[in-house]
């Protein structure tokens, strides 16, 4: 009986350790490696390009510091079943045509950041509004 209890406790302990894995962080390039950020509103197509290094650093930092992993998976090139979203494209210094994208959108009164095939994170509404506000400047 003691052996059975010991094995049961060991299995539960291992299960708890594996179930409490580290939360995945959004993967963005270093601001110094980015030459331009392009924000495009879908479906309108309104676009703004940001090349000022201080503003690029602020956007990258705001997204990195204000996202929380939802555990959701991204299986598409862009958000599925979301009609209106922002595409935030990052263009890098090191290779011509090398870029990455994060989609920002609102769904059921919550705001999200999604990286294709990587994951979905909650993003603070203030950051979402600040980035989307750049289209109106």
Q: Where is each model-derived feature located?
A:
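Positively charged n-region of N-terminal signal peptides that target proteins for export
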Residues: 1-9
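Post-signal-peptide N-terminal segment of Sec-exported extracytoplasmic proteins
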Residues: 39-75
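N-terminal helix-cap/turn-to-beta initiation motif at the start of protein domains
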Residues: 25-34
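C-terminal motif of bacterial Sec signal peptides marking the signal peptidase cleavage site
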Residues: 16-19
């Amino acid at each position: 009986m003691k052996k059975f209890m010991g094995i049961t406790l060991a299995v539960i302990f291992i299960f708890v350790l594996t179930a409490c894995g580290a939360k995945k962080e959004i993967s963005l390039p270093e601001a110094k490696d980015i030459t331009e950020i392009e924000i495009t509103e879908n479906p309108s197509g309104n676009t703004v390009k940001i090349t000022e290094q201080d503003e690029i650093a602020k956007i990258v930092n705001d997204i990195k510091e204000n996202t929380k992993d939802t555990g959701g998976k991204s299986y598409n090139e862009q958000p599925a079943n979301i009609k209106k979203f922002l595409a935030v494209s990052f263009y890098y210094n090191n290779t011509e045509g090398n870029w990455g994208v994060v989609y920002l959108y609102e769904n059921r009164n919550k705001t999200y950041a999604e990286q294709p095939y990587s994951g979905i994170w909650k993003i603070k509404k203030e950051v979402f509004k600040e980035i989307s506000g750049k289209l109106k400047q």
